Amino acid sequence: MQFFNFLLFYPVFMSIYWIVGSIYFYFTREIRYSLNKKPDINVDELEGITFLLACYNESETIEDTLSNVLALKYEKKEIIIINDGSSDNTAELIYKIKENNDFIFVDLQENRGKANALNQGIKQASYDYVMCLDADTIVDQDAPYYMIENFKHDPKLGAVTGNPRIRNKSSILGKIQTIEYASLIGCIKRSQTLAGAVNTISGVFTLFKKSAVVDVGYWDTDMITEDIAVSWKLHLRGYRIKYEPLAMCWMLVPETLGGLWKQRVRWAQGGHEVLLRDFFSTMKTKRFPLYILMFEQIISILWVYIVLLYLGYLFITANFLDYTFMTYSFSIFLLSSFTMTFINVIQFTVALFIDSRYEKKNMAGLIFVSWYPTVYWIINAAVVLVAFPKALKRKKGGYATWSSPDRGNTQR
């Protein structure tokens, strides 16, 4: 029975934690600021931002993204594009745009991964702050102002991660991910910000203090997710990371099951690589929020394997002809299903209410409230089974390269 309690109440406890954290964050920090007014900033005192765009085979999206960044009204900006040895015509497109626009183009001839590309770019950055964007990102006009404002009040702030929104919503899979980002992922980042440590910045859209990135030794070229890896390096050096929901961008997500699976396995593998690398270093720190983040990841992995072992044990020892046993098992199943569904409805309703401030039409996603978070846990469990062994086999000292998943339809 203790095993069952753990299997059921771990996801329930985490959902409640995210709900409470999101509500508190919203009423104490988020609701006080207007979406229609950017922070009051004196242009003469405005900090400059270098925008870094690393791209590999992004010919379908790089023109839109680069045009967007060039059109941003942020008064002090520098743009550096790094082509990471693309095998398509990405470089040709960038050279063509450069004929009529002012930006720095670093054209690497060999594909050595996003981390290496960012490292090459930041070394040429003139300003003290660098904005890292993916090649499919469309940045909201006011986002840089909201993000840079955070650094005024916290000298130990190393990075501010923004609020990514989904551009492609034409398919069912696109719509589901829209709701996922609006509810589950938004809840998690709000709660973690309150707890004092965000597990990871969003690689698609984050503003870094350049000196902090240099201090931690830049991005790791041998880690499959450079964003998670640099987040923990910042944590361990005493820097803080904040989530800024008012700073929005628009990105593309996979619209095929294969593309989504590939993306989630990479994310999970990257998290596990960081866990294996940084566990002992984390235990030596005196930052309690980092202990919470680390043990949350460990418990998530253990939860998956305990579920499998427990289900296997039940299957082997079950007497399917025993009416009492079957009745009891079915009752437990109904209880757990009702509990999870009830919590899911509350979590989705709260999250989408908060998120409706940014996209009111996302409230239509309430149709998914009863089942998607449960599916989310099941998908994550399957991903862990594949990703954790990959993390154990990580080759240190090389270059971690990967291709972007399918980007779907670009319609907003």
From Swiss-Prot:
InterPro entries, per the entry: Glyco_trans_2-like, Nucleotide-diphossugar_trans, PGA_PgaC/IcaA
E.C. no: 2.4.1.-
Membrane topology: Multi-pass membrane protein
Observed phenotype of the null mutant: Deletion of the icaADBCR genes leads to the inability to form biofilms, produce PIA or mediate N-acetylglucosaminyltransferase activity in vitro.
Domain of life: Bacteria
Main location: membrane
One of the GO BP terms on file: cell adhesion involved in biofilm formation
Pfam families from the UniProt entry: Glycos_transf_2
Ranges annotated as spanning the membrane: 6-26, 298-318, 332-352, 366-386
Molecular functions per Gene Ontology: acetylglucosaminyltransferase activity
Gene3D superfamilies registered for this protein in UniProt: Spore Coat Polysaccharide Biosynthesis Protein SpsA, Chain A
Keywords: Cell membrane, Glycosyltransferase, Membrane, Transferase, Transmembrane, Transmembrane helix
Intracellular or extracellular location(s): Cell membrane
Family designation: Belongs to the glycosyltransferase 2 family.
Name of this chain's protein: Poly-beta-1,6-N-acetyl-D-glucosamine synthase
Organism: Staphylococcus aureus (strain NCTC 8325 / PS 47)
